[in-house]
């Protein structure tokens, strides 16, 4: 079958393609090839800028023309590289041969072609291309979308800042809180973890076949290739070079990025489950869209499907991120090939995360606050003011206040406003203290 939205194996490229297609520019096979071309071109230019003696004749005016090879990179170019790979059976070598063909088209570059991929191993290209794709996907796709989600949560937190709400710990009534504050918990958590993610350095491996610049040093011992590599990776790619490596990246910092993303996902799972629960408790209703169906059998159903979709996709993302984080830093001796196939899946968790963020936003924007349901729960749970009463009584050195409130409230009998007021009136305290206690209600006992 021809590959399209209906025949794609992964729902990321099929059912959810409309949400994830933006990631193709970073994580598709086309994108990986393009990033490889970019790294190879910039490396050649940097050798010319050094300059190596044999490259002094390269006209600097050709640099922008060379950069246009990757700036204007087309699907036809990518296909040409795949055609070359079908012969070489080596993807990075195919990029090198493609660039030599492009040099031939320019003319006057024949003497310089052998400095394409000079002294490098494939992982000098892969372990710069992949981190660069991750960095740009984070900056251009992920950060804007997660920040949009945080902004939506903050809007609700501010809008509903004064709405009192019965808290639940262990699934049971607890001291009242405020709806806006509970949403602000997620704003706070997401912002903190996002800051941690942004602080993670994006690093790259660039140092030859076993990380020692052997080939560079034997050919040109007069140059400090470590300084060269640091400058190239930093100035041309915007990454940080890992100073000590084997043939491949240590992947420790990439793993840190994946772990940080996983923590953010975990916060989002918690958030989605809470909103799902609030809908189940009828604290929120959902906007109804004409024509939509909630169940094939039950016509009345309006399900919290967006929050469920988000939770499921975040779970998938975390499972993949976990494997990436624990597998990539482990490689036999100076390297084995297990990282290669794993790295090709870096875009997968990004896809699931983007789907989840958009589903979360969709669910949040369908919410309709149902204040009567929230207030009804508060009115039906006067036992939660027991903490307030016993705390004030402790302040006044009243004897055994906790035990007195426990005897009143820890029963299977309903605790009502009347029973609380009767308890207050029976206390051996001043009228001033009783007045202080009388104004405490489940609606007002919400802290600061």
Segments (PLM) and residue ranges:
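A helix-coil-helix interface module used to build multimeric assemblies
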Residues: 1-213, 220, 224-232, 294, ...
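Catalytic-core signal marking the mid-to-C-terminal active-site face
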Residues: 2-29, 64-71, 293-448
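Amphipathic alpha-helices that form helix-helix packing interfaces
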Residues: 43-46, 102, 149, 153-156, ...
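Amphipathic alpha-helical coiled-coil segments and their boundaries
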Residues: 134-135, 142, 183, 250, ...
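Alpha-helical coiled-coil oligomerization motifs
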Residues: 158-161, 202, 276, 283, ...
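Short, well-ordered beta-strand elements within core beta-sheets of diverse protein domains
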Residues: 181, 255-263, 388-395
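Glycine-rich anion/phosphate-binding loop at the beta-strand->alpha-helix junction
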Residues: 193, 240-242, 246-332
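Active-site-adjacent "gating/activation" loops or surface patches in catalytic cores
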Residues: 223-247, 251
């Amino acid at each position: 079958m021809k590959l399209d939205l209906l025949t794609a194996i992964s729902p990321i490229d099929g059912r959810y393609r409309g949400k994830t297609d933006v990631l193709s520019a970073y994580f598709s096979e086309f994108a990986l090839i393009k990033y490889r071309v970019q790294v190879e071109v910039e490396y050649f230019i940097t050798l010319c800028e050094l300059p190596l003696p044999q490259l002094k004749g390269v006209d600097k005016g050709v640099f922008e023309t060379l950069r246009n090879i990757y700036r204007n990179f087309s699907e036809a170019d990518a296909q040409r590289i795949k055609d070359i790979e079908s012969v070489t059976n080596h993807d990075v070598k195919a990029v090198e041969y493609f660039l030599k063909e492009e040099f031939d088209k320019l003319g006057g570059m024949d003497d310089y072609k052998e400095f394409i991929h000079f002294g490098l191993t494939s992982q000098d290209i892969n372990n710069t291309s992949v981190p660069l794709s991750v960095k740009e996907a984070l900056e251009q796709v992920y950060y804007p979308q997660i920040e949009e989600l945080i902004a939506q949560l903050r809007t609700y937190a501010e809008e509903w800042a004064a709405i009192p709400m019965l808290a639940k710990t262990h699934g049971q009534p607890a001291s009242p809180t405020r709806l806006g504050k509970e949403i602000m918990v997620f704003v706070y958590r997401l912002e903190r973890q996002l800051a941690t993610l942004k602080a993670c350095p994006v690093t790259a491996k660039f140092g030859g076949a076993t990380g020692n610049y052997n080939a560079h040093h034997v050919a040109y011992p007069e140059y400090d290739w470590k300084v060269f590599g640091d400058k190239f990776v930093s100035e041309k790619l915007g990454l940080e070079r890992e100073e000590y490596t084997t043939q491949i990246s240590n992947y420790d910092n990439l793993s840190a990025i994946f772990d940080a993303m996983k923590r953010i996902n975990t916060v989002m799972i918690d958030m989605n489950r809470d909103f799902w629960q609030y809908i189940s408790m009828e604290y929120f209703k959902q906007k109804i869209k004409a024509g939509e169906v909630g169940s094939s059998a039950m016509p009345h159903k309006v399900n919290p499907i967006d929050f469920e979709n988000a939770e499921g996709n975040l779970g998938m993302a975390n499972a993949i991120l976990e494997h990436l984080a624990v597998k990539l830093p482990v490689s036999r001796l100076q390297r084995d090939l297990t990282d290669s196939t794993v790295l090709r899946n870096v875009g997968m968790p990004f896809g699931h995360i983007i789907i989840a963020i958009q589903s979360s936003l969709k669910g949040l924007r369908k919410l309709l606050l149902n204040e009567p349901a929230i207030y009804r729960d508060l009115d039906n749970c006067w036992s939660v003011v027991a903490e307030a009463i016993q705390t004030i009584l402790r302040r006044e050195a009243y004897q055994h206040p906790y035990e007195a409130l426990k005897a009143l409230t820890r029963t299977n009998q309903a605790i009502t406003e009347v029973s609380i007021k009767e308890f207050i009136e029976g206390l051996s305290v001043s009228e001033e203290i009783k007045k202080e206690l009388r104004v405490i209600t489940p609606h007002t006992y919400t802290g600061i």
